[in-house]
Amino acid sequence: MKMKNFLSKSLLVLLIGLIGVKSADLSDCFSSRSTWYEAIQHGNCGYEQLTGKLGPGNLMIAAAATALYNGSFACGECYEIYGPGGTGKVMIVDQCPDPGWCDTPFPHLDLSPTAFNTTIGSTVGVAMTTVKKVSCDVTGNIKAYMKDAATTNTWFEFMVFNHRVGIASISVEDSKGTITSLPRRLYNYWTYNGNAASFPVIAHVYSIYGDQVDIYLTSSAGAQLYEGVGQFADPATTFADDCTAPFPVDTDGYIYDNGLVKPLNYNHPNLGWSDWSNGVTVNWADSSTPGADSTSKVVASGTLAYNTGIQIGTDLPVEWEGRFTALEFYIKADKDFTGLVVEYNGASKSQTPSLTTTWTKYTYDLTKDLGAPASLGKPAALKFRNNGSGSVKVYLDKIRLTPVASS
């Protein structure tokens, strides 16, 4: 065993690792989706209690979908999440098992309640987010924990944790100089299973960027905690720190255009506009009448009895000031009608357009005409409500929030 080399290499990495503790960006921004779960302790990565001796020391954690978990190689890595409620950093401590959410190639993260409330809020159960991989804000050296089991010098397992970046591989070198590469298990332990190892041994821990930190293991006895001589350094990267949370609706303002609009064609929960209608069945793909212009293949229609209406909403906050100025739409009816009210839930004003049997475009200033609330997301909803006498069939097309640049 080359103790001199062991100490010199490890001390070098220790000094490099102490130069800075701020996270480094380790990937470009990418689209993700997040849910939340409550059973956050004792996750698949083996950290047991999150605030215990093996855990990250806080509850800002996530369980990664199969594609991200990568057979436990994601354990201990960190991601910064940009959501509709804010930004937060999480460590991967578990694998997300839910079919449909977590077993697809899409990068899904199941968050702790703390992380979900920080980045998304408490009013929804799922949301789209923007994510990037970052180095972890851990302090101190890399650590190892010998499994609490009947370990021997021919079979032992240990977990390595408290690392700033991901681990690529581990090998052990015994006191006779024999080096053995170890496999990583799905439960995040590294296994030695072979000829009797001559203790003490050195665990050579290699990062995904090629750094090496060594951990001196004195015996195969289980439930022992060890500290390495060093910490991985942040790699030099050129990734831009320009992530933003996905805007929950179409940034060009379209609410209805041949269907209720989903931004960027993401057909995921909470993104885009949905049918929140009250007491009326809306045909969102009515092809029985020509649309307002040549690009219209279908329109929206519904027969409104008294005090029922077509309602359109979205779950996530839509803070419109500085982005949109007005609501515009085309409307007609099966007869002349003056009892329709256009309004938002929680708004201070409403409008009553006069309907005819031909398409008419209306544009209402969100502030002056509609007194729109600061957010057009839940609980606000756009309503086309019958406040007149008798029923009326209403047709709608090209519903849009007018962007500032277009006003």
Curated annotation (Swiss-Prot):
Residues 42-141 form the Expansin-like EG45 domain. It comes from the Eukaryota. Keywords: Disulfide bond, Glycoprotein, Secreted, Signal. It is found in: Secreted. Gene3D superfamilies: Expansin, cellulose-binding-like domain, Galactose-binding domain-like, RlpA-like domain. Glycans are attached at residues 70, 117, 387. The keyword Glycoprotein applies. Disulfide bonds join 45-75, 78-136. Residues 1-23 form the signal peptide. One of its GO terms (cellular component) is extracellular region. Unlikely to encode with a protein with expansin activity. Belongs to the expansin family. Expansin A subfamily. This is Expansin-like protein 2. The gene is expl2.
